[in-house]
Amino acid sequence: MAVDFVATEELVIAARRNLSQNVWDYLTGGAESETTMRRNRLGFDNLALRPRVLVDVSTIDAGTTFLGHRLRIPVMLAPIGSLQTLTPEGGVAVAKAAEQFGTINFVSSVTQPSLEEIAAASSSPKVFQLYVHGDMKWVESIIARVKKAGYHAFCLTVDTAYYGRRERQTMDRWLPPARRTPPDPRYQASLTWETMDAIKEMAGLPFILKGVATAEDAAIAVEHEVDVIYISNHGGRQLDHGRGTIDMLPEIVAAAGGRAEIILDGGILRGTDVLKAIALGAKAVAIGKLQGWALAAAGQAGLVRALELLENEIITAMGLLGVTRLDQLSPAYVCPAQPVAPAHEMSAFVRIPGGRLT
């Protein structure tokens, strides 16, 4: 039973046992030298927490809201392509887990089953995430389906002008299902702010811009009236030698100036990671690799268990920090620190065999 997992690293170990080498590398790897992916972890490891004491923390509320919807904890489920390679139900398992636990899932335009089937799998709010793989008529047809299916918000990914060089996959000579019939690359490569405006107007839903990595682009995004800035480097799978997402957060929060909500993904494996992001100005975070590992370990039940374990870590850390609500966190609760171990995609765990599964 999924409840038998007592720590998230047990889910990682089970996922490795269940996945082929090809699928494991697709889920776990990054681009080229995987420097960006490592920096996602390094950014969190470079921050220490500053607890306050003698505070009544007998009652703690770890919940928040996102676009008007209640989240049990400030953790959402990031869009992942080809989920069907991780668990037979694919995106349906994620939708059901999100509803069961009490969070929001992002549905990738390159996963299975269809966006309609995933939408029908649960009644909880969902966000549709789009890669532009066709002309504006194609985009319009997708948006019409999204609206009809009842999605609550629309997310446009903009850090994939070119597909990153993911060398684990290349050397495996394997492609995920979504890449086996390659999309026409000119559409993603030719996206501009004007294209984004047209898609935003067409969508007519709360609009999330995913892949923002600098203050400069955050400032432009709020001028274009996006509702949410989603800080992401695609889990370190696109541009190598980029920054970790938590390192981007302070400048983007400042540039947005409260005119858009800020969320981020990238390297989040622990409740303390979540709280560091909230303290520095994020409204919520999203998990990608951890979500995938949990699904591969035990499907829907595994993902619910991962969220339960994160919730326990978050509540424990809040109590030890001396806060009872997330809005009590601020930059005063974090400070620079030296990491104590080399950073990689599993360096937040202490009992992974050999320290890292490959």
Give the positions of each predicted feature.
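C-terminal helical cap(s) of enzyme catalytic domains, especially alpha/beta-barrels
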Residues: 40, 171, 241-254, 295-315
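A compact, surface-exposed functional segment
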Residues: 276-304, 336, 340, 353-358
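Glycine-rich active-site/cofactor-binding loop and its immediate structural neighborhood
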Residues: 71-117
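Short, conserved beta-strand segments within well-ordered enzyme catalytic domains
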Residues: 48, 54, 63-65, 74-78, ...
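Alpha/beta enzyme core
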Residues: 82, 96, 117-121, 134-264, ...
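Outer-membrane beta-barrel proteins
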Residues: 129-133
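An N-cap/entry alpha-helix motif that binds or orients negatively charged groups
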Residues: 1-71, 166, 175-191, 328-329, ...
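Internal helix-turn-beta structural module
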Residues: 300-328, 334-340
